[in-house]
Amino acid sequence: MAYRKSNLYLNLVNSYVIDSPQPSSINYWWNLGSLLGLCLVIQITTGIFLAMHYSSNIELAFSSVEHIMRDVQTGWLIRYMHTNGASFFFICMYIHIGKGLYYGSYKSPRVIVWTVGVIIFILTMAAAFLGYCLVYGQMSHWGATVITNLFSAIPFIGNDIVTWLWGSFSVSNPTIMRFFTFHYLVPFIIAAMVIMHLMTLHVHGSSNPLGITGNLDRLPMHGYFIFKDLVTVFVFMIFFSLFVFFSPNTLGHPDNYIPGNPLVTPASIVPEWYLLPFYTILRSIPDKLGGVITMFGTILVLLMLPITDRSIIRGNTFKTLSKFFFFLFITNFILLGKLGECHVEVPFILMGQICTFIYFAYFLILVPIISMIENILFYLTNKK
């Protein structure tokens, strides 16, 4: 027996990375998992080095970031890798979620895999928001003020929760210090959840584009899919390097290069680009509590898919009707992100409300109805 199989610890690695049987029909969309793992490693590694030089004191936070950029050897590289790494993390995550929606990765027997993935998504958004606040530029300060104020919409205890989050009566030194603590902690929780994600995936193995059981035609991970993953890793690193070395501030916001000032409100308060769709949904609801519930509902509705999708065929590969509405949903989501950059004025308010309705209608109305129609068509075709 090979040593990698006889050794207790190497056998664990072997079963996940080397001899893990994968369906032979999986395409390059299945490579997003390895890219997300790479992004997580980049974020944790660069984050640890940044934490060595960062000061969480509100008076020194902005200056410490400038110190990293100017005085720390290769500090500019570490910071730009971390900031652009967050954007690439979300790009890969959105594509990964889109792949799961298109190919029905949420359907039984992989419901737990999907559920853990949604939890990872929520934690990643939390980590991104906390990290964005730590720079303590103008957008960091006002973003922290606006988002934490959302908890004041909770009846009876909302204001107490906001005061507890701030550690004071406004965003101040205790706020930044506790945000830094949680921002350092959450990535390790995400790493633990990723291990759980892999463990649950390992039970039934990966799905495939055909939507059928692939147990009859599988290949080992090493030698086939490891090399396939490396191809996309190299492509990823090329685009990542282009941003880090040639256009590092493109995905950021110019107002965040101004020190935070609670006495001056920016012309437009917007989060990072990867949170814009959810910000649009929040702004589309006139009622504060309703907007908060709707915003959190945009993520939690993903957990409803295993229930609302009643199709007997996994994935949209052979379903024309589902394909059309899926790409309509993707277009709508991109439009939500674009509307998040716009000011709250006519016609963007109405457009945001329409896009919000379409977003929820896809999961709660269109998916159940379309799956029922396609099931009926499938049965009628079989009878012929």
Curated annotation (Swiss-Prot):
Membrane-topology descriptor: Multi-pass membrane protein
Chain sites annotated for binding a ubiquinone: H202
Keyword Transport carried by entry: yes
Gene3D superfamilies: Cytochrome Bc1 Complex, Chain C
One function term, GO molecular function aspect: ubiquinol-cytochrome-c reductase activity
Keywords annotated in UniProt: Electron transport, Heme, Iron, Membrane, Metal-binding, Mitochondrion, Mitochondrion inner membrane, Respiratory chain, Transmembrane, Transmembrane helix, Transport, Ubiquinone
Designated name of the protein: Cytochrome b
Organism: Eremothecium gossypii (strain ATCC 10895 / CBS 109.51 / FGSC 9923 / NRRL Y-1056)
The gene coding this protein: COB
